[in-house]
């Protein structure tokens, strides 16, 4: 297996131009495909998850031109639903941001009725989709499970989504609601969506609603408990759509600055629509010095203290707090993060396991993790298992800010969202 060893870093300094956001890139491509008119999507992320969406759209008859560096994509909108060739099968890797929204969009009524299969990597077949399928079926969709009940692969007939009253469980993933919201304007009737339980990751719903607005569709949001969407609408291309820098990817660089130097990230700022920008507020609460601009966030070292916090609203960036916690004074508790367990891997168990390898004292609960700080000279050199999970690889690069090297196994797994992560990270590292 490939691996990369990061030597101890004495300080960090510099500016990082962030790649486009994964969440925004895949939403933008799908909305542009369904919209009337041509959309030029700029600062698109070039990564595995985006490639899976682009390949799927091409197979569904969407025409687009991708620039040589793959960061600009001109999409010719269909002005409505997909034309599906019968017996088409789409392989979506482990891309939840492609699987979930496409599951809903492919249920919409096509010009001719046909069946399509959605499948992916073995891990995708372990990632639940029951709550989305249940909701779509209430709205009249025709979906079958091909292997295990509640999980991909799926067979979908494009008979249409009728709309009406739909209840959806919000407790596992906000992507289910995002998928339903994005397809609802193209349903035959108005849709009223009622959330069962507590809606997780609300800021991701804010992203969805803001982007739908950019493509000409308004949704009535009643305190995240009920959403009303008019049916029989069309998305209208805004002509150009700029994808913000990825706020989750920003977290590793900002944390490095907070631990041992000064780092600025550009492509995201105080007016960002991404919830993970709030990661900088968590660093500030821990003691770091944070500066916000229109198009940048900067983190500077100050003494860090542990924190006890509900991080349900920033589940991806919260992982970075788990490794940052080792460099603080006092214990850190990250709470209400059950949905770490249904991501690319079971992230709660994975983080606890790998943190212990570097010498940390950790307690893992059903939906929380307790982490004790570690003196710089007590870190152990470990081989970090990454579980084919890009975020684990990136989080554990911060361990090199101790006096000890860290070895990351399968570093190429960052290709899911940030193929050039390790070369970018090296740019800010200073060594004695």
Curated annotation (Swiss-Prot):
<feature type="binding site">
    <location>
        <position position="22"/>
    </location>
    <ligand>
        <name>phosphoenolpyruvate</name>
    </ligand>
</feature>
<feature type="binding site">
    <location>
        <position position="339"/>
    </location>
    <ligand>
        <name>3-phosphoshikimate</name>
    </ligand>
</feature>
<feature type="binding site">
    <location>
        <position position="27"/>
    </location>
    <ligand>
        <name>3-phosphoshikimate</name>
    </ligand>
</feature>
<feature type="binding site">
    <location>
        <position position="391"/>
    </location>
    <ligand>
        <name>phosphoenolpyruvate</name>
    </ligand>
</feature>
<feature type="binding site">
    <location>
        <position position="96"/>
    </location>
    <ligand>
        <name>phosphoenolpyruvate</name>
    </ligand>
</feature>
<feature type="binding site">
    <location>
        <position position="201"/>
    </location>
    <ligand>
        <name>3-phosphoshikimate</name>
    </ligand>
</feature>
<keyword id="KW-0963">Cytoplasm</keyword>
<dbReference type="GO" id="GO:0008652">
    <property type="term" value="P:amino acid biosynthetic process"/>
</dbReference>
<feature type="binding site">
    <location>
        <position position="316"/>
    </location>
    <ligand>
        <name>3-phosphoshikimate</name>
    </ligand>
</feature>
<keyword id="KW-0028">Amino-acid biosynthesis</keyword>
<feature type="active site" description="Proton acceptor">
    <location>
        <position position="316"/>
    </location>
</feature>
<dbReference type="GO" id="GO:0005737">
    <property type="term" value="C:cytoplasm"/>
</dbReference>
<dbReference type="InterPro" id="IPR006264">
    <property type="entry name" value="EPSP_synthase"/>
</dbReference>
<feature type="binding site">
    <location>
        <position position="173"/>
    </location>
    <ligand>
        <name>3-phosphoshikimate</name>
    </ligand>
</feature>
<dbReference type="InterPro" id="IPR036968">
    <property type="entry name" value="Enolpyruvate_Tfrase_sf"/>
</dbReference>
<feature type="binding site">
    <location>
        <position position="22"/>
    </location>
    <ligand>
        <name>3-phosphoshikimate</name>
    </ligand>
</feature>
<feature type="binding site">
    <location>
        <position position="175"/>
    </location>
    <ligand>
        <name>phosphoenolpyruvate</name>
    </ligand>
</feature>
<dbReference type="GO" id="GO:0009423">
    <property type="term" value="P:chorismate biosynthetic process"/>
</dbReference>
<feature type="binding site">
    <location>
        <position position="174"/>
    </location>
    <ligand>
        <name>3-phosphoshikimate</name>
    </ligand>
</feature>
<comment type="similarity">
    <text>Belongs to the EPSP synthase family.</text>
</comment>
<feature type="binding site">
    <location>
        <position position="416"/>
    </location>
    <ligand>
        <name>phosphoenolpyruvate</name>
    </ligand>
</feature>
<dbReference type="InterPro" id="IPR023193">
    <property type="entry name" value="EPSP_synthase_CS"/>
</dbReference>
<dbReference type="Pfam" id="PF00275">
    <property type="entry name" value="EPSP_synthase"/>
</dbReference>
<feature type="binding site">
    <location>
        <position position="23"/>
    </location>
    <ligand>
        <name>3-phosphoshikimate</name>
    </ligand>
</feature>
<feature type="binding site">
    <location>
        <position position="343"/>
    </location>
    <ligand>
        <name>3-phosphoshikimate</name>
    </ligand>
</feature>
<feature type="binding site">
    <location>
        <position position="127"/>
    </location>
    <ligand>
        <name>phosphoenolpyruvate</name>
    </ligand>
</feature>
<comment type="pathway">
    <text>Metabolic intermediate biosynthesis; chorismate biosynthesis; chorismate from D-erythrose 4-phosphate and phosphoenolpyruvate: step 6/7.</text>
</comment>
<comment type="subunit">
    <text>Monomer.</text>
</comment>
<dbReference type="GO" id="GO:0009073">
    <property type="term" value="P:aromatic amino acid family biosynthetic process"/>
</dbReference>
<dbReference type="InterPro" id="IPR013792">
    <property type="entry name" value="RNA3'P_cycl/enolpyr_Trfase_a/b"/>
</dbReference>
<dbReference type="InterPro" id="IPR001986">
    <property type="entry name" value="Enolpyruvate_Tfrase_dom"/>
</dbReference>
<dbReference type="GO" id="GO:0003866">
    <property type="term" value="F:3-phosphoshikimate 1-carboxyvinyltransferase activity"/>
</dbReference>
<keyword id="KW-0057">Aromatic amino acid biosynthesis</keyword>
<feature type="binding site">
    <location>
        <position position="347"/>
    </location>
    <ligand>
        <name>phosphoenolpyruvate</name>
    </ligand>
</feature>
<protein>
    <recommendedName>
        <fullName>3-phosphoshikimate 1-carboxyvinyltransferase</fullName>
        <ecNumber>2.5.1.19</ecNumber>
    </recommendedName>
</protein>
<comment type="function">
    <text>Catalyzes the transfer of the enolpyruvyl moiety of phosphoenolpyruvate (PEP) to the 5-hydroxyl of shikimate-3-phosphate (S3P) to produce enolpyruvyl shikimate-3-phosphate and inorganic phosphate.</text>
</comment>
<feature type="binding site">
    <location>
        <position position="175"/>
    </location>
    <ligand>
        <name>3-phosphoshikimate</name>
    </ligand>
</feature>
<keyword id="KW-0808">Transferase</keyword>
């Amino acid at each position: 297996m490939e691996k990369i060893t990061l030597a101890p870093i004495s300080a960090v300094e510099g500016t990082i131009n962030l790649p486009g956001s994964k969440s925004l890139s895949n939403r933008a491509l799908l909305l542009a495909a369904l919209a009337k008119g041509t959309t030029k999507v700029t600062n698109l992320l070039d990564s595995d998850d985006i490639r899976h969406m682009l390949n799927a759209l091409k197979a569904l008859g969407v025409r687009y031109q991708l620039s040589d560096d793959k960061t600009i994509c001109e999409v010719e909108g269909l002005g409505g639903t997909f034309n599906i060739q019968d017996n088409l099968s789409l392989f979506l890797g482990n891309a939840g941001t492609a699987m979930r929204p496409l599951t809903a969009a492919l249920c919409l009524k096509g010009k001719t009725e046909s069946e399509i299969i959605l499948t992916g990597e073995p891990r995708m077949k372990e990632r639940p989709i029951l709550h989305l399928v249940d909701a779509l079926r209430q709205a009249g969709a025709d979906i079958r499970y091909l292997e295990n009940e509640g999980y991909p692969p799926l067979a979908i007939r494009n008979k249409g989504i009728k709309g009406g009253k739909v209840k959806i469980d919000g407790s596992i993933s906000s992507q289910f609601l995002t998928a339903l919201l994005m397809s609802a304007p193209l349903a035959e009737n108005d849709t009223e969506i009622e959330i069962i339980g507590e809606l997780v990751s609300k800021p991701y719903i804010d992203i969805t609603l803001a982007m739908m607005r950019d493509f000409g569709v308004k949704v009535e949001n009643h305190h995240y408990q009920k959403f009303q969407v008019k049916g029989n609408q069309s998305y209208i291309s805004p002509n150009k759509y700029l994808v913000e820098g990825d706020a989750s990817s920003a977290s590793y660089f900002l944390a490095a600055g907070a631990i041992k130097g000064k780092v600025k990230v550009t492509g995201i700022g105080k007016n960002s629509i991404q919830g993970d920008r709030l990661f900088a507020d968590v660093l500030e609460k821990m003691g770091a010095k944070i500066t916000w601009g229109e198009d940048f966030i900067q983190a500077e070292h100050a003494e860090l203290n542990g924190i006890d916090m509900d991080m349900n609203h920033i589940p991806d960036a919260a992982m970075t707090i788990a490794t940052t916690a080792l460099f603080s004074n006092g214990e850190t508790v990250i709470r209400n993060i059950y949905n770490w367990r249904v991501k690319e891997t079971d992230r709660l168990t994975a983080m606890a396991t790998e943190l212990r390898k570097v010498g940390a004292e950790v307690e893992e609960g059903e939906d929380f993790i307790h982490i004790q700080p570690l003196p710089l000279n007590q870190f152990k050199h470990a081989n970090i298992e990454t579980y084919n999970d890009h975020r684990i690889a990136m989080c554990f690069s911060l361990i090199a800010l101790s006096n000890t090297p860290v070895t990351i196994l399968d570093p190429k797994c960052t290709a899911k969202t940030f193929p050039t992560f390790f070369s970018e990270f090296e740019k800010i590292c200073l060594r004695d």
